[in-house]
């Protein structure tokens, strides 16, 4: 048959490609009326002809008489030739569609024989029905996904461009149905804790449908659960005023009740639904517990005691659900971690929303900082890096909010003291924490304290037997008792001794007992507990092969909480496979732990012993300088790899050419995603390596490693640790009187301070860095710090001074052929020109910067170029062009996981939309900026809130606008920002109206 004219077009959203390739017809009415075959659009004719097709499709196979079709197309005033026109339209459509699809019968027409799901509306109905069933069954995750797929089938206005009263009626009907689906999906979003994400969408929807109270109710709840109580109450005030002005009525009872519950801070408002507690999003369900040992033995009374406490938290006890904390105290090696991990694994089913674990390194020289731990926990719970605040208090509050309504078990291992632990505790019922420490945490309020002593002799013997084997122990029971006694009944010592015997099939238990007795006599000056552990370590170490002993000594030197296989290979100067074989053999002897595939760590007592062995070996002249050489290789490995990551993320940036040379190679990556994954995964051991190099000949390389890893400054989870390391290196380089190294250290510190919005402190560091870099004739640092100082000037509105600094940076970058640096300074110079009122020059300079970025490839830095040009075009009033630039920037920032820059771009999009008279779109983008966070910390958040207030004011939401301005004013006042006066004026004008 004649298939009719066909126009190639992209596949219709919502229809799977495999279905379209089958040759079957597909139709769309949830947008323009269209038809497809094999992915190509069919010509469906004039608007009236499409109106006829839509009327037949929406009758779902039922016959429409000619009279009904005439009424549908023209209503009460049809043309004189209406019947002939209907017949003509039907005839033309038959030629386009498959045979037998449009049929004539009983004086009318019908569409028949369509494949299942051929009509987008039918697919949406099926998906919505399936979503309702999933929701009723308690599977909210699946229900949300189904509703999202249903809503994605809409492609603009229903029956767009189709005339006639029938089409108008269907537009209203299907528009109302879509809103109902949206409300249902948003309700489930809130049930599953997606509060911040929902605020943006709800803000836009309430602006588009201001009298729809259900949307207002959802917005109030989303704001309240996002910690924005004042705005939530302001939404109610705006709604009450609007309903009174427009309809002369009060808000419905449900909305009034919600307002009262918010005023009373009703704790039930913060709770998620019961279904949500059972079906928490899988991707946000961490399972971080270390593996439990297969030979766990004894401690039955402690297991019962701790399990009972966890049962109270999980709601399985008679008293109902509580927030439970248990703190285990005992000497090193007594088995605190083993017991806690064993109990935690037994209780996993009672905490279906996840289990968090951290080694707090409380017995080490550098215990983990609560800020850093909270950052890692928040990331594991699904919080974006950009949404993680800087301060300990804010991180702890966000952590408690994220855990609210969830049932999560937190294992805080090897804690230093209660002060380290308190910020890491959940805040609501249903969660629990297990804490291990060497001190009794009597000052940890409400904690159930457990004192763990050495094992009873029979328990110790049972553990020894389980590792060695019943057959070998049965005939030498007394010797076995002598062994566990010589181990001081400490589980760690018993495990190491037993593992050594298990690996020596020719030894008897008596031989092991005699060797331990000899070691203890040699170490009789030690205290009893230390004596037992040291003797066990000596025995284990003394039986290692030379290669194993060397690996044991050198791996203990690194300060990080753990070490990757690749980094360990650098420490040992061995191929990866040989390194893995050695490390796994040490795991078999219980001298090393496998924290995760490809990652290893020491028990802190074993690490101390390994370092003592390294010192002793070097002191005795058996391996001169092996410690320094090993740590130097580790630093080289991190520096070379981080430099490679930097080069991938910043092509054309010659900074890497000026780094200290390395003798040991690093890893190589072919694409940015894997490179950034490595950097974020290795953040803690990498920064530990930097700090460990202070006061050594490795100082300059350590500072360069900090510089090469500067992407960590924009990672919310790592920024605090990075800043602390930068400050430590500033002190170390100052003490060493190394001007070049100190200049670079202070340059990266000024970066951190700029990103977090601490402008005055950033200026202090940048000025000092420039003086130091100039004295050291470090041209790379001079150019970058000039750029940083220029950015400080932009924040402080000292535009002419900033312009001079950017010109200095551009000249320096050009002198060293640093194209990426040149592009960055050009983009910033554009902003300085804007501040001085030179809009045309700003646009031209921004285009120059973008052109340089474009030469370097489609990288994250190209996004910075589009961003800068978008800002300039906005000031020039060229709003549509600006939107295009920001859209390009947003895509690139998203591809490179630069969420803070995504937030900044959404802020700029909000500016454009507001300037173009689209306050609803402006409010939506401002909300997205708040959810993502922005470069600039609290000051930038103040800017976003001030802009959001302007958009809401334009939408008639005066109370919520004032709430935003008040919060912005509070943030500005904390930082003594120049915008204080502007926001006060906005508030004054708003109140005066």
UniProtKB/Swiss-Prot annotation:
Gene label: afsR
Region (Disordered): 1-21
Superkingdom of origin organism: Bacteria
Chain positions recorded as ATP binding sites: 330-337
Protein name: Regulatory protein AfsR
Biological source species: Streptomyces coelicolor (strain ATCC BAA-471 / A3(2) / M145)
Residues annotated to bind DNA: 17-113, 796-811, 974-988
Record remark: domains: The N-terminal and the C-terminal regions are independently capable of directing actinorhodin production.
A GO biological-process term: regulation of DNA-templated transcription
Family: Belongs to the AfsR/DnrI/RedD regulatory family.
Entry-linked Pfam families: BTAD, NB-ARC, TPR_10, TPR_12, Trans_reg_C
């Amino acid at each position: 048959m004649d298939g009719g004219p066909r126009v190639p077009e992209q596949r219709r959203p919502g229809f799977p490609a495999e279905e379209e390739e089958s040759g079957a017809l597909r139709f769309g009415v949830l947008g323009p009326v269209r038809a497809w075959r094999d992915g190509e659009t069919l010509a469906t004719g004039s608007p009236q002809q499409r109106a006829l097709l839509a009327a037949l499709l929406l009758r779902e196979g039922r016959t429409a008489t000619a009279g009904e079709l005439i009424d549908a197309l023209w209503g009460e005033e049809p043309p004189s030739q209406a019947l002939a026109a209907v017949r003509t339209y039907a005839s033309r459509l038959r030629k386009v569609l498959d045979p037998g699809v449009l049929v004539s019968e009983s004086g009318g027409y019908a569409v028949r024989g369509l494949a299942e799901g051929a009509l987008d509306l039918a697919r949406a109905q099926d998906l919505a029905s399936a979503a309702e069933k999933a929701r009723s069954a308690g599977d909210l995750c699946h229900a949300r996904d189904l509703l999202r797929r249903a809503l994605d089938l809409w492609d603009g206005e229903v029956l767009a461009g189709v005339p006639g009263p029938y089409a108008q009626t269907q537009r209203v009907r299907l528009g109302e149905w879509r809103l109902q689906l949206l409300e249902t999906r948003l309700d489930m979003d809130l049930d599953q804790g997606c509060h911040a994400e929902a605020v943006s969408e709800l803000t836009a929807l309430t602006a588009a449908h201001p009298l729809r109270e259900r949307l207002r109710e959802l917005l109030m709840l989303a704001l309240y659960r996002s910690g924005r109580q004042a705005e939530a109450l302001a939404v109610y005030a705006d709604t009450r005023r609007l309903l009174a002005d427009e309809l002369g009525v009060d808000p419905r009872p449900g909305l009034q009740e919600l307002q009262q519950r918010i005023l009373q801070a009703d704790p039930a408002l913060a709770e998620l639904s019961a279904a949500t507690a059972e079906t928490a999003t899988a991707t946000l369900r961490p399972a971080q517990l270390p593996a439990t040992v297969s030979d766990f033995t004894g401690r039955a009374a402690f297991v019962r005691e701790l399990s009972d406490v966890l049962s109270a938290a999980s709601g399985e006890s008679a008293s109902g659900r509580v927030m439970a904390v248990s703190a285990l105290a005992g000497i090193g090696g007594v088995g605190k971690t083993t017991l806690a991990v064993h109990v935690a694994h037994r209780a996993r089913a009672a905490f279906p929303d996840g289990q968090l674990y951290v080694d707090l390194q409380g017995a080490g020289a550098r215990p983990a900082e609560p800020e850093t731990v909270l950052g890692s926990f928040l990331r594991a719970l699904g919080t974006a890096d950009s949404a993680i605040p800087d301060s300990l208090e804010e991180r702890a509050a966000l952590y408690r909010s994220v855990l609210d309504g969830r049932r999560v078990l937190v294992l805080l291992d090897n804690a230093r003291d209660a002060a380290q632990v308190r910020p890491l505790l959940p805040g609501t019922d249903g969660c629990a924490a297990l804490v291990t420490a060497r001190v009794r945490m009597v000052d940890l309020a409400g904690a159930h304290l457990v004192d763990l002593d050495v094992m009873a002799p029979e328990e110790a013997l049972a553990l020894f037997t389980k590792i060695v084997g019943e057959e070998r122990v049965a005939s030498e029971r007394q010797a076995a008792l002598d062994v566990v006694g010589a181990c001081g009944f400490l589980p760690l010592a018993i495990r190491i001794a037993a593992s050594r015997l298990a690996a020596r099939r020719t030894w008897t238990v008596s031989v092991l007992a005699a060797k331990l007795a000899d070691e203890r006599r040699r170490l009789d000056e030690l205290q009893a507990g230390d004596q037992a552990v040291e003797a066990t370590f000596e025995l284990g170490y003394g039986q290692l092969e030379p290669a194993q002993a060397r690996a044991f000594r050198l791996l203990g030197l690194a300060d990080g909480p753990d070490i990757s296989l690749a980094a360990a290979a650098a420490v040992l100067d061995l191929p990866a496979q040989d390194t893995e074989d050695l490390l796994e053999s040490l795991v078999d002897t219980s001298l090393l732990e496998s924290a995760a595939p490809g990652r290893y760590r020491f028990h802190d007592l074993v690490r101390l012993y390994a370092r003592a062995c390294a010192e002793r070996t070097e002191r005795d002249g058996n391996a001169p300088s092996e410690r320094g050489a090993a740590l130097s290789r580790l630093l080289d490995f991190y520096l070379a790899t981080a430099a490679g990551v930097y080069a991938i993320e910043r092509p054309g940036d010659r900074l890497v050419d000026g780094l200290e040379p390395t003798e040991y190679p690093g890893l190589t990556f072919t694409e940015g995603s894997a490179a950034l994954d490595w950097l974020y995964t290795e953040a803690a051991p990498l920064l530990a390596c930097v700090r460990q190099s202070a006061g050594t000949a490795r100082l300059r390389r350590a500072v360069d490693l900090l510089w090469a890893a500067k992407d960590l400054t924009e990672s919310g989870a790592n920024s605090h640790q990075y800043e602390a390391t930068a400050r430590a290196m500033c002190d170390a380089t100052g003490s060493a009187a190394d001007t070049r190294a100190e200049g670079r250290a202070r340059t990266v510190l000024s970066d951190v301070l700029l990103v977090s919005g601490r402008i005055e402190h950033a200026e202090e560091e940048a000025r000092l860095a420039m003086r130091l870099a100039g004295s050291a004739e470090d041209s790379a640092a001079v150019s970058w710090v000039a750029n940083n100082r220029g950015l400080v000037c932009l924040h402080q509105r000292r535009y002419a001074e900033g312009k001079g600094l950017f010109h200095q940076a551009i000249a320096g970058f050009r002198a060293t052929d640093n194209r990426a640096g040149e592009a960055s300074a050009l983009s910033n110079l554009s902003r300085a020109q804007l501040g001085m009122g030179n809009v045309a020059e700003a646009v031209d300079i921004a285009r120059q910067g973008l052109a340089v970025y474009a030469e370097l490839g489609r990288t994250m830095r190209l996004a910075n170029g589009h961003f800068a040009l978008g800002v300039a075009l906005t000031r020039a009033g060229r709003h549509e062009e600006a939107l295009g630039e920001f859209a390009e920037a947003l895509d690139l920032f998203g591809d490179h996981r630069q969420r803070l820059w995504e937030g900044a771009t959404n802020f700029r999009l909000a500016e454009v939309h507001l300037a173009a008279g689209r306050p609803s779109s402006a409010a939506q983008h401002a909300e997205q900026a708040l959810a993502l966070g922005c470069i600039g910390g609290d000051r930038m958040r103040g800017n976003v809130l001030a802009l959001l207030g302007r958009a809401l004011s334009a939408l008639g939401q005066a109370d919520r606008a004032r709430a935003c301005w008040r919060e912005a004013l509070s943030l500005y006042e904390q930082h003594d920002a120049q915008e204080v006066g502007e926001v006060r004026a906005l508030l004054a004008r708003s109140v005066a109206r």
